[in-house]
Amino acid sequence: MKKNALINAELSYVVATLGHTDEITICDAGLPIPDETQRIDLALIPGVPTFIDTVKAVLGEMQIEGVVMAEEFAQVSPDLHQALIALIRNEELLCGKKITLSYVSHEAFKVHTQDSKAVIRTGECTPYANVIFQSGVVF
């Protein structure tokens, strides 16, 4: 369910049309995006927009109840992983609900993106900077 206003019309529309348990993926510049999945390509140049800035914008709009990440994210890019975890924990405090964290292999993550309503590509060039958000409800 949508919470606020985004400037990007395509992204705003996707968030507004999410139902309970629908998923979207936010990814780095290198994640392969399935042909059959809607691609919202925000990448301009390497590093713009960042993964974290994109996550913040989406969290400002979307109620989440679950998160899926690749196990490799925490191992290979621990600083960015911890920044994401901090945002998720803050979101839990703001919404007063527990958000489930799940980890899968990077290969399984890539397969899981096929279930996303959309994949949002950022300019992030940090390895494994990818997350799947599962939509929750605001009530």
UniProtKB/Swiss-Prot annotation:
One Gene Ontology term, aspect cellular component: cytosol
Subcellular location: Cytoplasm
Gene3D superfamilies: RbsD-like domain
Cytoplasm in keyword set: yes
Primary location class: cytoplasm
A Pfam entry, by short name: RbsD_FucU
InterPro entries per record: D-ribose_pyranase, RbsD-like_sf, RbsD_FucU
Pathway, per record: Carbohydrate metabolism; D-ribose degradation; D-ribose 5-phosphate from beta-D-ribopyranose: step 1/2
Active-site residues (renumbered): H20
GO molecular function: D-ribose pyranase activity; intramolecular lyase activity; monosaccharide binding
Reaction(s) catalysed (UniProt annotation): beta-D-ribopyranose = beta-D-ribofuranose
GO biological process assignments: D-ribose catabolic process
EC number assigned by the record: 5.4.99.62
Swiss-Prot/TrEMBL keywords: Carbohydrate metabolism, Cytoplasm, Isomerase
Residues engaged in binding substrate: D28, H106, Y128, A129, N130
UniProt enzyme class: isomerase
NCBIfam families from the UniProt entry: PRK11797.1 (NF008761)
Family recorded in the similarity comment: Belongs to the RbsD / FucU family. RbsD subfamily.
Entry function: Catalyzes the interconversion of beta-pyran and beta-furan forms of D-ribose.
Subunit relationships: Homodecamer.
Protein's name according to its UniProt entry: D-ribose pyranase
Annotated source species: Photobacterium profundum (strain SS9)
